[in-house]
């Protein structure tokens, strides 16, 4: 085997590992969103606005170039060059277009993966990452992350109080 073949094999192996990490991270992002929706105790997946359009209570996406939320499917979101997945969760704070929907930036990174489970670091709005160890279908692994997201939303809502009422 030539030295070039060695390099080609190594390059192929690294690309395969990157794909494995992407698959794992997107699976866990999907599980986080699913857990979060259930954890919130939403009355339904969607609410109907005054025009009869269905609006999701929780939506996933990214902030576009114009600074606006762009919905996207997790499996279509690009991985960052540092091996992380950055997404934005938009949560409606009521069933009315006049009530704010709050966007929360969330970043996931696989720290390790093995037969026992997967270790993921999740940061909410750039805060210190929350370590999450997930085994199989352990639903409650994301409780601390959900609480952090809720806290972020509460602070965003409280900032909207009129100054005279603070």
Residue ranges and their predicted role:
Residues 5-6, 20, 49, 59, ...:
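Acidic-enriched, low-complexity/disordered segments with a strong bias for Aspartate over Glutamate
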Residues 8-15, 40, 93, 153, ...:
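Generic secondary-structure transition motif, activating predominantly at the C-termini of alpha-helices
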Residues 109-166:
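Glycine-rich, aromatic-bearing surface loops/beta-hairpins
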Residues 1-63:
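Charge-rich, low-complexity N-terminal segments
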Residues 15, 19-27, 75, 132-139, ...:
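Short, charged/polar micro-motifs that form catalytic or ligand-binding hotspots
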Residues 50-110:
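Amphipathic, interaction-prone secondary-structure segments
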């Amino acid at each position: 085997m030539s030295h070039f073949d060695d390099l080609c094999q190594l390059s192929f192996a690294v690309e395969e590992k990157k794909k494995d990490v992407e698959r794992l991270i997107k699976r866990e992002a999907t599980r986080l969103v699913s857990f979060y929706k259930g954890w919130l105790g939403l009355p339904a997946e969607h609410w109907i606005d005054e025009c009869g359009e269905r609006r999701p209570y929780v939506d996933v996406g990214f902030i576009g170039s114009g600074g606006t939320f762009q919905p996207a499917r997790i499996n279509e979101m690009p991985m960052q060059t540092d091996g992380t997945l950055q997404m934005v969760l938009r949560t409606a704070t009521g069933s009315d277009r006049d009530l704010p929907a709050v966007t929360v930036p969330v970043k996931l990174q696989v720290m390790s993966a093995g037969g026992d489970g997967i270790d993921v670091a999740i940061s909410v709005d750039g805060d210190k990452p929350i370590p999450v160890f997930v085994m199989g279908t352990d639903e409650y692994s994301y409780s601390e992350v959900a609480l952090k997201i809720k806290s972020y939303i509460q602070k965003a809502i409280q900032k909207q109080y009129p100054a005279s009422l603070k």
